[in-house]
């Protein structure tokens, strides 16, 4: 079946859904403070969607008008069968952008193969340029390995490479300028993300770790000419700025200070197959159950369309409080 010419995924607030974030594992070789507990108990493998189920899910969504799929985790590149998955996703009719979010620890060996499979854009997490601090934030990560992975991604020829940085007031707030200069030197982009109030963080509580995007913008505007960039139709929530005199952009993802709910174009499928309407709410349907119950493609697509009545107008993040959403980012899809 060919993808339809007009979108079928429209919620009750007239938001057109054309972007799916697909988590393929909750497992990761890092234990980042803002993402998961240090003693995280991972899902039984039988509870995670199989490669075949992931490919079927992606195909059904493209048939419903989704144009962009971002593969997330956990760390996607440690998933068994990930090569097969990317080749299948890259061949989907109607899919315009296949993207990946990764911690970079496996990119040195896989970047070229990902480009060949059809991955066009890649986001790489990098929260510090100091080896000791990087290890403190990730608990297990090796900075040099990630830096080599970033350089491999640049050399591989992705259409866009972006660094994602979560800034925490008690840890890495002082690295805004060095990280931006790092991106500029490699002619890649960088996005600074306000810490999401999910799971836990150990730096004095989430409210104390919070850093506003506006403060970062103001700091960088003192060093660079920043010109707001027009977002692509399938773009995520980042507000991007061209950095004058460079080939790089800086973005700010601001769930607290400048929420992006009014233009939300996304749905999420978690590693265990929950179709989540919103990162900051618990409304979902059990897509895994639908896939494993022998339902036809049309029946599953009908359930997906019907589920959009649950998509809320906005998230319920509330910075001064501790997290209202108890699931961790690795289980949701970062």
Language-model features, listed with the residues they occupy:
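Glycine-centered loop/turn positions within well-structured domains
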Residues: 30, 131-132, 259, 285
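Conserved, mostly hydrophobic/aromatic
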Residues: 24, 32, 71, 100, ...
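Radical SAM/AdoMet-radical enzyme domain recognition
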Residues: 51-71, 78-193
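Auxiliary Fe-S-binding modules of radical SAM enzymes
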Residues: 2-19, 181, 185, 192-334
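Pocket-edge positions in alpha/beta enzyme catalytic cores
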Residues: 12, 46-49, 74, 99, ...
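A short acidic, helix-capping loop that chelates divalent metal ions and anchors anionic groups
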Residues: 40-44, 108, 130-137, 199-204, ...
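Canonical Radical SAM [4Fe-4S] cluster-binding loop centered on the CxxxCxxC motif
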Residues: 12-52
